[in-house]
UniProtKB/Swiss-Prot annotation:
Record-linked CDD domains: Chorismate_synthase
Protein name as catalogued: Chorismate synthase
Top-level division of the source organism's lineage: Archaea
Cofactors that this protein relies on: FMNH2
Species of the source: Methanococcus maripaludis (strain C5 / ATCC BAA-1333)
InterPro entries associated with the record: Chorismate_synth, Chorismate_synth_AroC_sf, Chorismate_synthase_CS
Length: 373
């Protein structure tokens, strides 16, 4: 329920307004060089206050490592890390504790469990992805250290506005690690984490939604470069199946596609098929329309993934709901501090889950020694 992975396992815990949140990572081999700073850097990318489009909730998200790392290297024992909540304002939710918020998991949690933490959504809050990022930071370090695998994410669409940058517009760009490093810098210096030339138009779109007390969603593209051929399995533990499960498990994700995705339904087979050719002593694909995965197994080409993110459900507009005590219809006005768009902050979470998935399957596929590096 709260654990992802079979060999490289990440268990997350904590609630939005609880004392702390964190993760336990089990199955990471020993001797992996890693520091608190490596993990903190990833947490900083997810932290509130990233940009003008982020929630004004003030949180340091300062990491504390409790176990599993000694003298700058993993020990092979469970790695435990936590972050203390410091900026929660639970009184913001006291007026609506009996009125489930539309678009949130409040009502479903109440109907299923009877008792739920209404403060900021409790366990269903996006803040709980702190644990995902802690685990993902370790996984990123593991797959990059052992196989130089790079994972990068960016927004390609904000609301109804399409960007002009994505993998299929220039796949050759992603052949260079230097290009990827430059792209990362560009993304991190953009408030929407969007490398497109028309990102200013996207910013105006979000600002307009904010003026209307509304919110905006978008589409994120994730590229996994350097993953070797043979990662994944043919039937139930398919690489794309595991990635889909990892991504759909993240709050706000409502759609997932690989490679050409839904566009492939419009193509002829002759357009979709990736022809092969000999490149010295190896077989390569002339194109990568399948997104780096065929038959549940990585092809060696970059894995190309896209995810649809819904608009942030917490908006300032008055909405319709019900009172769980009186069983009567009721208007609800949500206070508190919320993101007008969650897309930029979801990107490091998606990268983290991609890294955890790849690390897990690379161990089971024999590419990483489960005991020590």
């Amino acid at each position: 329920m709260n654990t992802f992975g079979d060999n490289f396992r990440v268990t997350t815990w904590g609630e939005s307004h609880g004392k702390a949140l964190g993760a336990v990572i089990d199955g990471c081999p020993s001797n992996l060089p890693i520091s608190e700073e490596d993990i903190q850097n990833e947490l900083n990318r997810r932290r509130p206050g990233y940009s003008i489009f982020s929630t004004p909730r003030k949180e340091e998200d300062k990491l504390e490592i409790l176990s599993g790392i000694f003298e700058g290297k993993t020990t092979g024992t469970p790695i435990s890390g936590l972050v203390f909540n410091k900026g929660q304002k639970s009184k913001d939710y006291s007026k609506i504790k009996n009125t489930p918020r539309p678009g949130h998991a409040d009502l479903n949690y109440f109907l299923k469990y009877g008792n739920y933490d209404y403060r900021g959504g409790g366990r269903s809050s996006g803040r709980t992805t702190i644990g995902n990022v802690i685990g993902g930071a370790v996984a990123k370090k593991l797959i990059e250290f052992t196989h130089n695998i790079k994972i990068i994410g960016y927004s390609t669409k904000i609301g109804k506005i399409n960007g002009d940058f994505d993998y299929y517009k220039n796949p050759e760009f992603f052949e260079s690690n230097s290009n990827i490093e430059k792209l990362f810098e560009k993304i991190e210096n953009n408030p929407l984490r969007c490398p497109s030339k028309n990102s200013d138009e996207m910013k105006d779109y979000v600002l307009d939604a904010m003026d209307k007390q509304d919110s905006v969603g978008g589409i994120i593209e994730i590229i996994i470069k350097g993953i070797p051929q043979g990662v994944g399995n043919p039937v139930f533990n398919k690489l794309e199946g595991k990635l889909g499960s990892a991504f759909i498990g993240i709050n706000a994700v409502k759609g997932f596609e690989i490679g050409r995705g839904f566009e492939s339904s419009e193509l002829y087979g002759s357009e979709m098929n990736d022809s092969y050719y000999m490149n010295k002593d190896s077989i390569k694909g002339k194109t990568n329309n399948t997104g780096g995965i065929i038959g549940g197994i990585s092809t060696g080409s970059p894995v190309v993934l896209r995810v649809s993110i819904k608009p942030t459900p917490s908006i300032s507009k008055i909405q319709e709901s019900v009172n769980l005590i009186s069983n009567e219809n009721e208007k609800i006005e949500i206070g508190g501090r919320h993101d007008p768009i969650i897309v930029p902050r979801v990107i490091p979470v998606l990268e983290s889950m991609a890294a955890i998935t790849v690390a897990d399957l690379m161990i089971s596929s024999g590419y990483i020694d489960p005991c020590r590096i």
